[in-house]
Amino acid sequence: HLAVFDKTASNPQAHIGEAIALFQAQAPDVSLHLHVAPLNVIERGVLDGQFQVGIVPGHRASSALTYDELFSETMYLYCGQAHPLFGASAAQQPADWAALHAYAFAGLGYHSPNMELAQQVQLTRQATGYDQESIATLILSGRYLGFLPDHYAESFVRQGRLRAVQAPVFSYRCSFFGIVRASPQAARVTLAFQACLSAAHRPPSSV
């Protein structure tokens, strides 16, 4: 059972499909069960044995889990078409984090890089979502600002439904990790899948 944080399939840096292909070539008789879940659910599921492997954005490390860095993504702050900042000129855009306090913010409702940053810069959270889809829906309402992965928001931007707010200023990078339970040691099939994940995300050799 593999559990993945949502909206990773559209990330060009994520090679989870390639890892699955590698694993199936090595272990064709093993059935895979793929789940999409929030970060806290994945961590808890790996710890209690519901999931053998998880793929999550990095935040607070747990000594009960082992972490293998795989890929990253860039998060930008977006507004919807009906938001006052959507049509604002560059000069009218907020210049720093403090200037965002005047606007309602939609954030993830569990411990994550999203929540940590929002608390650190004291954004005015007035709506809570529990996955990227719900955050996108709240932003599209035009009532809230919120962070989304650039690869997920790209189609909405092309359609003219979302706009990044001061992308050079209001952004952060997020690393994703493969996680397994530290103890007891994972089964051989789990370790084999973890090795396939690492291999699929290894930078190509320059030789």
Language model regions located:
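Short beta-strand-centered segments that line the small-molecule binding cleft or hinge
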Residues: 19-22, 40-75
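Short, well-ordered beta-strand segments
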Residues: 1-6, 54, 106, 146, ...
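C-terminal regulatory
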Residues: 67-143, 148-172, 191, 195-207
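Periplasmic-binding protein-like
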Residues: 168-183
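Residue-level signal for nonpolar/aromatic packing positions in well-ordered secondary structure
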Residues: 2, 23, 46, 52, ...
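Short helices/loops that flank or line small-molecule/ion binding pockets
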Residues: 35, 40-51, 132-143
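N-terminal winged-helix
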Residues: 1-26, 31
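General small-molecule cofactor/ligand-binding pocket signal
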Residues: 33-37, 163-165
